[in-house]
Structures are given as C-alpha cells and as structure tokens.
Curated annotation (Swiss-Prot):
PROSITE patterns: SNAKE_TOXIN (PS00272). Its main location: secreted. It comes from Trimorphodon biscutatus. The lineage of its organism: Eukaryota, Metazoa, Chordata, Craniata, Vertebrata. Residues 20-34 form a propeptide. This is Toxin 3FTx-Tri3.
Amino acid sequence: MKTLLLALVVVAFMCLGSADEVGLGNEQIDRGRRQAIGPPFTRCSKCNRNWSPPFPLGLYTVSHVKSCGGHLSSIGQCGEDWVVKGCAKTCPTAGPGERVKCCYSPRCNKN
C-alpha cells in the first residue's frame, strides 16, 4: 500500500511540475523534424481520445527558446532550440526559457 501511494505521489509531482522538471531535457532530438525521438517520447504524438469528461487527454508542445544577448526573444529571431511533444491531462507549466502550447484537437500536435 505504501509503495502504491509513493508511486502516485511521484506521478502527481511529475504531472504538476514544470515541463523542464519532468526531465524532458534528456531525450534525443530529431533536428530535422524538431521533435523528440525514441521511446517513450514518441508514444504521445497522438493522444488517446477515449477519456471521459471532465478529464480529456490533451496535447502539448514545449519549446526551449534560445536566448539572444541574455534576453529571450521571439521564436522568429533566435529560433527554437528543440521541441518536445506529448500528452497530458493538464497543460504543463512553462519553465525558464520555455514556451508551452496546449490544445485538445487531434491535429494540433503535428505543427
């Protein structure tokens, strides 16, 4: 019982934390497609929509933005360092230097 409770606490902490805190910076990146590759990072490019309301499974994209002269600027000026795509019940909180886009459409995570 204690093990199950500990596992639930760890999962809750990971889901509620910043996208950077969840360890999204450790995966391999396909620079051509600007997307995380390899298990388990590609399994959420399309979310399972079989969740009953009020808990839909949404898609999110996390962009780490390069800084220009110590200041974060728009994506167009400095470009995205890399992009992570995944699924979550709630939108993750953007950490320092991150931009998070969340949506609930099956097509929104293809950008």
